[in-house]
Amino acid sequence: MSILDEFKSFIAKGNVMDMAVGIIIGAAFTGIVSSLVADLINPIIGLITGGIDFSNLFVNLGDGDYASLAAARDAGAPVFAYGSFITAVINFLIIAWVVFLLVKIVNRVKDAAIHKSAKEAEAQPAGPTQEQLLAEIRDLLKRSPA
């Protein structure tokens, strides 16, 4: 088997296709979560904490005084932008929580399907064994005129 054939076989597997779909959906989901955090959660946290905007929290490591992180970055000042890190952590926690819930739901659905198929398998009467079928064939052959 050539390397190209092996690659085609690898790509055609269901897990690779599922992973590709997951990555595409995950990339789209990241934008949604970023907007959720920046536009909805951070303002609520800011309201609770007295108007703190996490995305604008920074420590200036150089000379000068800057009113905002954007102004410090525009001036080329070295900054320790810990507010951006806090926002990234909040994004991560939300994404991790949603993925956890999705995996939990998928596992419940799988378990329910497995449980249902196991019940159906128990409910079906067992068919004749191979020996019983062979014995029936033998008996039929004995009875039939040659």
UniProtKB/Swiss-Prot annotation:
Its membrane topology: Multi-pass membrane protein
Keywords for the protein's UniProt record, in alphabetical order: Cell inner membrane, Cell membrane, Ion channel, Ion transport, Membrane, Transmembrane, Transmembrane helix, Transport
InterPro entries: Mechanosensitive_channel_CS (IPR019823), MS_channel (IPR001185), MSC/AndL (IPR037673), MscL_channel (IPR036019)
UniProt subcellular location: Cell inner membrane
SUPFAM superfamilies: Gated mechanosensitive channel
Gene Ontology terms: cellular component: plasma membrane
Gene3D superfamilies, alphabetized: Large-conductance mechanosensitive channel, MscL, domain 1 (1.10.1200.120)
One Pfam family matching this protein: MscL
GO molecular function: mechanosensitive monoatomic ion channel activity
TM segment ranges: 21-41, 44-64, 83-103
Subunit structure of this chain's protein: Homopentamer.
Function summary: Channel that opens in response to stretch forces in the membrane lipid bilayer. May participate in the regulation of osmotic pressure changes within the cell.
Family: Belongs to the MscL family.
Official protein name in the record: Large-conductance mechanosensitive channel
Organism this protein belongs to: Cereibacter sphaeroides (strain ATCC 17029 / ATH 2.4.9)
Phylogenetic placement of the source organism: Bacteria, Pseudomonadati, Pseudomonadota, Alphaproteobacteria, Rhodobacterales
Gene name linked to the record: mscL
